[in-house]
Regions:
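Intrinsically disordered, glycine/charged-rich C-terminal tails and inter-domain linkers
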Residues: 1, 132-278
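Catalytic NTP-binding/metal-coordinating core of nucleotidyl cyclase/transferase enzymes
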Residues: 1-77
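Extracellular structured ligand-interaction cores
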Residues: 2, 87-91, 132
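Short catalytic/ligand-binding loop motif for oxyanion handling, primarily in non-cytosolic enzymes
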Residues: 14, 100-103, 143-147
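Catalytic core of nucleotidyl cyclases, primarily class III adenylyl/guanylyl cyclases
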Residues: 40-66, 82-116
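Short, well-structured alpha-helical interface segments that form or flank functional binding sites
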Residues: 70-73, 89, 117-121
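Short secondary-structure capping micro-motifs at structural edges
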Residues: 76-80, 111, 121-124
Length: 278
């Protein structure tokens, strides 16, 4: 039994279609270089992994608490580093079960990468079940992590369309409140025309946040970046941002929180207008 993580680049196929060959090669080169460098500086003792194109498979030696903590730490740090260095958003999943990477005889012109095991299949299938940039967890991995307690602040149980999902976030509210990080995030979202993944990522970053000032600030900053500080000139960007927030695949609780911000912003604007008239 092992823990297996499967990660890949959000929207890679769409990106590839817009790139020339040398741009795609540079993109993948930057992705793999950052992953390798982060791997080297981590204190890894119980993990192995390999990269194929835009995908990264990481697996543990066993299912000990140490192995689980290590794979979660490494996955989280790699995801954050890829975003910080390359503006690459990763999504993925972690599952638990049988897994084996088979050693096979190779020749110089034909290399083999043979893997087998239910844990890999589960992680691969889980990866796309939640439209977000977080890491989806199998139920047993979530339970193991909750028992350890180390990452409980970033673990969430979310019911989406009457089905329970377990998510590990790597983009926190404090991380996104850093101007450079949020600017990169909005740029990617604008390029993707604000797919549900981006709203749901914001939702998980806000989840369980008790500081209302921070919540208000992240929405305020988002609007400012979406319209590039010129709302009257770039109103179409704002319209798209608001309209797409209510797509079917955006988590309902995000829509509720977003509407609360809009109401609050309108009320504040009316109060300011009343004060001016007085």
């Amino acid at each position: 039994m092992k823990y297996v993580a499967f990660l890949d680049v959000l929207g890679f196929k769409d990106k590839l279609g817009k790139m020339k060959q040398y741009e795609a090669a540079e993109f993948i080169g930057n992705f793999s270089t950052t992953a390798f460098r982060q791997w080297e500086i981590e204190n890894i003792s119980k993990l192995k992994g390999y990269i194929v194109s835009d995908s990264f498979v990481i697996y543990s030696d066993d299912t000990s608490c140490e192995a689980l903590e290590e794979i979660v730490r490494v996955v989280t740090n790699i995801c954050r580093k890829e975003f910080a260095d390359n503006s690459i958003l990763l999504r993925g999943a972690i599952a638990k079960g049988d897994f084996e990477k088979l050693e096979a005889k190779e020749i110089s012109t034909l290399q083999k990468g043979l893997i087998v095991g239910q844990a890999y299949v589960d992680a691969y299938l889980l990866e796309g079940t939640v439209k977000s940039t977080g890491i989806v967890l199998s139920a047993d991995v979530y339970e193991d992590l909750m028992n350890i307690g180390t990452y409980s602040d970033n673990l969430f149980e979310e019911i989406i369309e009457k089905k329970t999902h377990y998510v590990l976030r790597y983009l926190t509210l404090d991380f996104l409140l850093v101007e450079k990080n949020l600017s990169s995030f909005v740029e990617l979202a604008n390029e993707a025309k604000w797919l549900p993944h981006y709203y749901n990522t914001i939702y998980f970053s806000l989840k369980q946040e008790q500081n209302n000032k921070k919540v208000y600030q992240i929405f305020f900053n988002l609007f400012d970046l979406v319209c590039k500080g010129r709302p009257s000139e770039n109103w179409r960007n704002i319209d798209l941002f608001i309209e797409n927030a209510f797509q079917d695949n955006v988590i309902e609780n995000f829509k509720t929180r977003f509407l609360k911000y809009i109401r609050q912003h309108i009320c504040n604007a009316n109060i300011q207008l009343d004060n001016r008239e007085k």
